[in-house]
Swiss-Prot record:
Catalyzes the transamination of N(2)-succinylornithine and alpha-ketoglutarate into N(2)-succinylglutamate semialdehyde and glutamate. Can also act as an acetylornithine aminotransferase. Its cofactor is pyridoxal 5'-phosphate. Belongs to the class-III pyridoxal-phosphate-dependent aminotransferase family. AstC subfamily. InterPro entries: Ac/SucOrn_transaminase_bac (IPR017652), AcOrn/SuccOrn_fam (IPR004636), Aminotrans_3 (IPR005814), Aminotrans_3_PPA_site (IPR049704), Class-III_PLP-dep_AT (IPR050103), PyrdxlP-dep_Trfase (IPR015424), PyrdxlP-dep_Trfase_major (IPR015421), PyrdxlP-dep_Trfase_small (IPR015422). PROSITE patterns: AA_TRANSFER_CLASS_3. GO terms for biological process: alpha-amino acid biosynthetic process; arginine catabolic process; arginine catabolic process to glutamate; arginine catabolic process to succinate; ornithine catabolic process. The lineage of its organism: Bacteria, Pseudomonadati, Pseudomonadota, Gammaproteobacteria, Enterobacterales. SUPFAM superfamilies: PLP-dependent transferases (SSF53383). Keywords: Aminotransferase, Arginine metabolism, Pyridoxal phosphate, Transferase. GO terms for molecular function: identical protein binding; pyridoxal phosphate binding; succinylornithine transaminase activity. This is Succinylornithine transaminase. Its EC number is 2.6.1.81. Pathway: Amino-acid degradation; L-arginine degradation via AST pathway; L-glutamate and succinate from L-arginine: step 3/5. It catalyses: N(2)-succinyl-L-ornithine + 2-oxoglutarate = N-succinyl-L-glutamate 5-semialdehyde + L-glutamate.
Amino acid sequence: MEQPSPVTRQSFDEWIVPTYAPADFIVVRGEGSTLWDQQGKSYIDFAGGIAVNALGHGHPAVRAALIEQADKVWHLGNGYTNEPVLRLAKQLIDATFAEKVFFCNSGAEANEAALKLARKYALDNFANKAGQQGEKNQIVAFRNAFHGRTLFTVSAGGQPKYSQDFAPLPGGIHHGIFNDLASAEHLITDQTCAVIVEPIQGEGGVLPADKEFLHGLRALCDRHNALLIFDEIQTGVGRTGELYAYMHYGVSPDVLTSAKALGGGFPIGAMLTTTKYASALSVGSHGTTFGGNPLACAVAGTVLSLINQPTLLAGVKARHQWFIDELAEINARHNVFAEIRGRGLLIGCVLNAQYAGKSKEIVQAAAQYGLIALIAGPDVVRFAPSLIISPKEIKEGLARLAMGIEQVCQKVTS
């Protein structure tokens, strides 16, 4: 076979639609929580592909599942079912509140399905009913949320910077203030068909929901016959130390969306719900070509079986504390963080006023010393590493972060 021609970071600028601005280096290999670039430089991975690589890179059991299924059948289309999708559905049902699952390819698709389901259920059950004032099709979401990039989900996200250039946007979506129950109560009415919320706002700054807030939303949805949708794209599949974050709060949604870590790096999304609400979607009412394909589901089934173990989930909580302790020491030396927040291995370091707006600069500086991390807006440095990252890798990665922080501090104070 002919050898591929060399590519560089400049190739991206020449050939790829400029929706992203990737780092200057190109990663060519990964193992566990270590990545290597074209020049052979190694990096400790605290980003995890944005909360995707929950078992690190190249986990042997996940790789074996992919290879085994690749030797059988890759794709069939939705005119046929397959064994891996049925097994994965049963795994998710057994592990959660759900009774039915819809599979797709991404978090955005899962949220799109959830919002469509809510409107269809309301149409079927409340349209033109006695006492119903107006159409029951309104959706309540929250400011600074992120639910995907489709026109529907980006409109629900409540961040105009992602949606304002694509007007006219879908109507009937209202945004409340996250963690402000009075704001939500003002918006949720008998015309509301759904409330969609992240248990932790990820892109919005790694901001956990208050327990009282989610319980209040549950009560408001029950009062007004609205579906409560938990977007667990980023928080799901062990990320917070429970299989899904709703389990921390003692409140169950009507619909839950999952993606990212579900495939451990292989694209897959899922919408979980109960039989009552799933019945609103009939044959042909919704679908997606690659949803539930055997390759993705074989991988996801293995990922889920490995993560949904008490020892692993307890390990996520322990690793959270290791991060917190080390970050506190860094902050004692450099005084850059106003707050360190999050759950499990979704952690946000909020920069104080002196370093406001410098999250990207800190992440770029840390990369020079061999750490890959994330931002969650201009003021938050974010970590979402492998759930099985070792204590040694955490300590070394944070030492590299400290070097990057020191570099930025010198610029600020000079």
